Each structure stands twice: as C-alpha cells, then as structure tokens.
Amino acid sequence: MPTDFLFTSESVTEGHPDKIADQISDGVLDAIIAKDPQARVAVETLVKTGLAIVAGEVTTNCYVDIPKLVRSTICRIGYTDSSMGYDGNTCGVMVAIEGQSQDIARGVDNKKDQGAGDQGMMFGFACDETPELMPAPIHYAHAITRRLADVRRKQHPWIRPDGKSQVTVEYRDGRPARIDAVVVSTQHSDEVSNKKIQEAIREDVIANALPKKLIDNKTKFFINPTGRLVAGGPMGDSGLTGRKIIVDTYGGMGRHGGGAFSGKDPSKVDRSAAYMGRHIAKTVVAAGLARRCEVQVSYAIGVAEPVSVMVETFGTATVPEERIALAVRKTFGLRPREITEYLNLLRPIYQKTAAYGHFGRTEKEFTWERVEEKKDALRDAAKSATPSGGRRLKAV
C-alpha cells in the first residue's frame, strides 16, 4: 500500500432503509434474548413503502409480539407520518419465522463444547489513527451521520430520517493529514429551500462533526449534490438486513469475511468472532505491540476450536509478529462459548449496534471495545513468547 493516498469511507443514518432493517432484526433478537438467553435467532428484514417483512429461523421458549416491535422501532427512528413516505403506525407487517434446522442444532447445541454456528472467516481491525483506535475515514463519516440525526431531532425538523455521509481522507507518510472531500445527503421535507439545506448541513452538522485542523481551503463539500431528496427512506429504496456490512465495520480499511451481524445471536460466529477479532486487534494496538493490526479467525460448522488464526501488523509491529500471534492464542479463548462468556454477549444489547457502526463505540454495552483488562497480559505474553523454528506464524 502506498504511503501517500486518498481513502474514502461512508456512513448512513438510522433512517436509511438498510439500517431500518438491521435495527428491526436486532430488535427482534434483543426481545427474544432478554427472555430466553439461550435462544437461537437468525432474523432478516425487508422494508419497502408501506411494508415490513420479518423472516428467519428462531428456536425459543418465549413469545415476542414481533409486529408491535417492528412498528415501535420504525416510529422510534422517526418514520411517524405518511408524508415521509413511510409510517410505522400504519405500515403492513408480515412475519415468516420457522425453527432452526435440527442439522445445525446438533453441532451447535452441545452442552460440553458449543460448536460454531457456521463455517466462515471473520476479521478484526484496529489502528492508532483516532482515540477509539478506528480508521479516520469511517470514524469521521459516522461522526457526521450521528450529528445529522441529532440535529434532526433537536434543531431542524425539516430534516427527515434518511441520510448518508462520505469522507475522503488524505494520507501522507501513511498518516491522516487532512480531509479532502465531504459528501452529505439528507432526506428533507418538500418546502425547505436548497439554500437552507446547504447552510444547515455545513454550519450545524459538518462544522460540529469534523476537526477544524483537518479542514482547509482545498477541502471539497458536496451537500445533497442531486439537488432534492424528498422521497427517501423505504419509499426511495428497499431496505434489507445485512447490506451495510462495510459501514458496520471499518469502512473498507480492514477486510471483511462477508457475514453480516444484525439479527444473529452470539452462537453465530459471523457476529461473535468478528467482535472478538476487533477486541484482539484493538488490544494489540492499545498494548503498543503495533500501530495497525488485523486478525483473521476461521471456523468449521459444529467445531468449537477455530480452524485458523492469523495476525497481520502491516510492518508496524514493535515485537516480532509471530510472538504477537502466539501471545494472542495464549491470552484469548476463541471457542464460541468462550467468546460469548468473555464478552458477555447473552444480553439484549444488539439494537444499539445496528446504526453508526459496531466498532469504535464508547457505550458500556460494547464490551469488545474494552481492552484494559488484557492489555498488560498480552504485552507480557508477546515479550516472553518463544517462536518455533523462526518462521512467521500465519495459522495455528
């Protein structure tokens, strides 16, 4: 990778159609797991004008009023009137849910050692570009969309729930130097003028979301570049669970295994192992073992022990990379049950993750972001690790 380059990441607001779907799916998960922590949940949602469809597989001993939950989620997001093109009070709700396949359950529901809920590879990433140890482009893109939602609720009611941001950061010598371009698109009511939209987004959103030191007279701003965005939300585009996996993670800076998070209980390693990968990578960086770290973990369905573990530090490690990989295996348990217990994942914490990113957050529910407990232990383990044969460890 070159040391001087431009890198772009995007974010979307909670009112984006795909994020409505994610929040509904995670709302269903939370409602079930609050009553039955051992439930198996895999729920997908589709939203379109006047309609929400919830489908998937659930095995539980509890009852959840899914249509009521769907409506309350849509209304909380801000779609409460037909003038917005979508109304949680009146939209139709369809539910198509069956039990989990017994073939899958045999491998996962093992009382002695819970197997992975599916095969696959998951990635975790961290870098020292921001205090949250997240890449700068996605960090600032999320800052804009969170601020956009806040301004909508508190200051400018003509802003509608659907919105997007995009931030391009210029890197020099591999470090963020300035913001080169900012794109913001927001749904709005029909009567507001383009001039008012431009002023409000520039002064009340962007100016309060981005560091002034990264903005200069060459920074380019594109605010509602198509001119008008009245027909937004599910009226403008259909929304599906799991279509914003790059927004959910690292904005493209770190790799992604392809598995979405929302609507899945922690037995699905698509979610739990990705959270653990982030936790490990962040701990590596916080411990001063590297400035950038990516962790890959892979699993076979029904098997508890990971098939492989890989640690990559992109030439930024302060100790040999093989030692870091050995220290990771010594310090962290990577079996699904170990991950679930260590990160305390059997709680109704997931709807909050379904907008503005699963990583780089400071709320108490995001246990995978806490690194103080294992930081020193990992550093000590890396210093004392004894590599075998002097070769670089890629899989263990």
Swiss-Prot record:
Reactions catalysed: L-methionine + ATP + H2O = S-adenosyl-L-methionine + phosphate + diphosphate
Enzyme class, spelled out: transferase
GO cellular component labels: cytoplasm
Named cofactor requirement(s): Mg(2+); K(+)
Subcellular location: Cytoplasm
Residues bound to L-methionine: 57, 100, 237, 268
Residues given in the record as ATP binding sites: 16, 162-164, 237, 243-244, 260, 264
Binding site for K(+): 44
UniProt-annotated binding residues for Mg(2+): 18
Cystine bridges: none
Entry keyword Cytoplasm: yes
GO MF terms, alphabetically ordered: ATP binding; magnesium ion binding; methionine adenosyltransferase activity
Subunit structure: Homotetramer; dimer of dimers.
The protein's name: S-adenosylmethionine synthase
